[in-house]
């Protein structure tokens, strides 16, 4: 459990784990009671609102990738040139066009499989979600959850969330 955990969502639906992707296939989305009814699916228990004066929206809670089997050192060693990114925040998605953007507070350059002393900050990542997910080639065996985030919708509609998981080796557009 984390600061974003709850037993019932704000629609009164029992909270449960929702596996979004399984074996590389999108198997479920997050829903609140209204969206599940409209789509003819079972609600996932993700209807959350900032306060009783606000509308419930489908929101993330504790969102993460499950750990893999790769050692972080092996992942770094496999990279000819790239960046290891840290402290991601400010994620934003476009559900209609499958675009994503988020910010890492800093990155460390990797050259010939070794971390360098070259730091960059901040780092903006962007891309097309299916391409990003398909590009994941390694997943570390470590796992860490951070509970200090929030998910925003509409005008000043914030709820607490956690995210994290293992390190991922993927191709993303940096700016």
Predicted regions and their residues:
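N-terminal small-residue-enriched
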Residues: 1-175
């Amino acid at each position: 459990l984390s600061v974003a955990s709850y037993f019932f969502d704000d629609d009164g639906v029992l909270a449960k784990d929702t596996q979004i992707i399984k074996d590389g296939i999108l198997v479920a989305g997050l829903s609140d009671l209204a969206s599940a009814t409209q789509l003819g699916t079972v609600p996932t228990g993700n209807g959350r609102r900032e306060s009783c004066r606000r509308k419930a929206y489908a929101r993330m809670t504790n969102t993460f990738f499950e750990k893999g089997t790769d050692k972080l050192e092996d992942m770094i060693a496999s990279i000819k040139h790239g960046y290891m990114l840290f402290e991601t925040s400010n994620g934003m998605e476009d559900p209609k066009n499958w675009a994503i953007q988020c910010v890492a507070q800093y990155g460390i350059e990797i050259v010939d499989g070794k971390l360098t002393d070259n730091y960059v900050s901040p780092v903006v990542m962007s891309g097309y979600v299916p391409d990003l997910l398909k590009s994941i080639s390694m997943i570390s065996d470590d796992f860490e959850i951070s509970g200090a985030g929030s998910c925003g919708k509409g005008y000043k509609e914030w709820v607490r969330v956690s995210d994290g998981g293992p390190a991922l080796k993927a191709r993303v557009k940096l700016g």
